[in-house]
């Protein structure tokens, strides 16, 4: 599982007046566990298990934070990310995916996500990603010859050209 590695400390949830969080995932046990964990951390959680439900929540009351699965039974989580980014540009969105690869990461960021995390998602990693300071760049992995380093460099270069 990928962990967000920041050079400087993250923001605190108390820095945000709006603590609303949408968790969109069709995996009921994962969504339930993550929802409970994020509520304990202070987020006000709304759950959705389909693109249709997620879009309804985003249009009615756009959350400040969102954790969105990429592949859902009724469509693509990128549609929800795009709609939330349009309705609330300052929202902080993290994409969850069991299919972590470079094109997925780039598509998520282009749609408005600030990060992506491979499943199974750990609540601490999700919180770190949601609260990452937008003014700080993610540090590259420590092993300069690792596959993670190569992936990070490629993502970084790809994002420069967005």
Model-found features: residue ranges?
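Short hydrophobic/Thr-rich beta-strand motif most characteristic of the beta2 strand and flanking loop
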Residues: 42-49, 57
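Acidic catalytic/metal-coordinating carboxylates
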Residues: 50, 76-79
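Active-site beta3 strand of CheY-like receiver
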Residues: 61-67, 72
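C-terminal output helix
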Residues: 101-103, 120-130
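Conserved small/polar residues in nucleotide/adenosyl-binding loops
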Residues: 160-162
């Amino acid at each position: 599982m990928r962990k967000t590695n920041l050079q400087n400390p993250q923001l605190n949830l108390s820095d945000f007046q709006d603590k609303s969080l949408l968790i969109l995932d069709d995996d009921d046990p994962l969504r339930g566990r993550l929802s409970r964990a994020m509520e304990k951390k202070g987020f006000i959680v709304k759950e959705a298990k389909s693109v249709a439900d997620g879009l309804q929540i985003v249009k009615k009351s756009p959350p400040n934070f969102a954790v969105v699965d990429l592949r859902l039974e009724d469509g693509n989580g990128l549609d929800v990310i795009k709609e939330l980014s349009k309705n609330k540009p300052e929202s902080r969105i993290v994409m969850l995916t069991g299919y972590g690869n470079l094109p997925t990461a780039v598509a998520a960021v282009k749609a408005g996500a600030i990060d992506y995390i491979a499943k199974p998602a750990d609540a601490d990693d999700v919180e770190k990603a949601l609260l990452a300071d937008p003014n700080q760049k993610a540090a590259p992995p420590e092993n300069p010859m690792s596959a993670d380093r190569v992936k990070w460099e490629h993502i970084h270069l790809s994002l420069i050209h967005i």
